[in-house]
Each structure stands twice: as C-alpha cells, then as structure tokens.
Amino acid sequence: VRSSAASDVYKRQVLAFAQAIKELKAEGGIVARNKRYSENNRILIEEMAKLGIKPYIESTHQGPIITTFYYPENSNFDFAEMYQYIKDRGYAIYPGKVTDAQTFRIGTIGEIYPEDMYKLSSIMTDFLNSKK
C-alpha cells in the first residue's frame, strides 16, 4: 500500500513523463529532437572557436548532449567569475572537474535552442572582452 504522499509523487512523475512524451511528439519525434540538439552543439562549438575556446573531445567523438571545453588562454580568466557573469544573465554552465585539465562544460539539450547558443556566445564574448 502506497502512502498518500508517495502516491502523489508517483502521479506527478507519470504526468511529467506523459507531458515530456507529448512535447517530444509535437517536436517531430526523436529524430527531430536529436537534430535540434546536434545543431545546438554545432553552433556552440563554432561560436566557442571564434573565441579561441577549444573543445576537450575531438569532434569525431563528441555527442550532442554536453560539451567540455578547455579554459580560455587568458591569464585573467577565472571560472567562478565567468560562471557568475553568465548566471546573472540567465544562463548556466558547469565546472569541468571530470578531467585533470582545466575545463568547463555546456549542455545543449532540454529547452535550449540555437538562439540560446548565440546568446550564450555573446555573453561569453562580453565577459572575455572585459578581461583584456
């Protein structure tokens, strides 16, 4: 027998899953969703390259979910400061402490679209320019 609270949690989870499936179908299914995620990732990598920021993983091995980048080659760079700058402007990135290298990560899935990749790039450009 489930408790009332556990039952409510279960119902919310089922409803959330049903909504996620509905949104996936509305977007055109898995193929269309993957296309958007892949496009987000392509744009992100291109925009970061313009800033001189290189991906940690070679493109042949890179998936469209999250991308790890090396820190910019700027002696004034501070990840915590950049993180806060980006967060204050409505976006989030992640520390890249899954490697021994100095890296950070950016996700490209979920409610994220190509225009978000361009906006994030613009925010990062402004931040890095302020450090010159």
Task: Tell me the role of every PLM-derived stretch.
Residues I21-Y56, Q84:
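Conserved PLP-dependent catalytic core of the aminotransferase class-I/II
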Residues V1-A6, Y10:
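Single conserved hydrophobic/aromatic residue that forms the stacking wall/gate
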Residues Q102-K132:
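PLP-dependent enzyme catalytic core of the Aspartate aminotransferase-like
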Residues F79-K87, L120-T125:
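Short amphipathic alpha-helices in soluble, non-transmembrane regions
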Residues A18-E23, T125, N129:
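Short glycine/serine- and small hydrophobic-enriched flexible loop segments
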Residues K54-Y85:
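Conserved PLP-binding catalytic core of the aspartate aminotransferase-like
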Residues R89-R105:
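Conserved PLP cofactor-binding pocket of PLP-dependent enzymes
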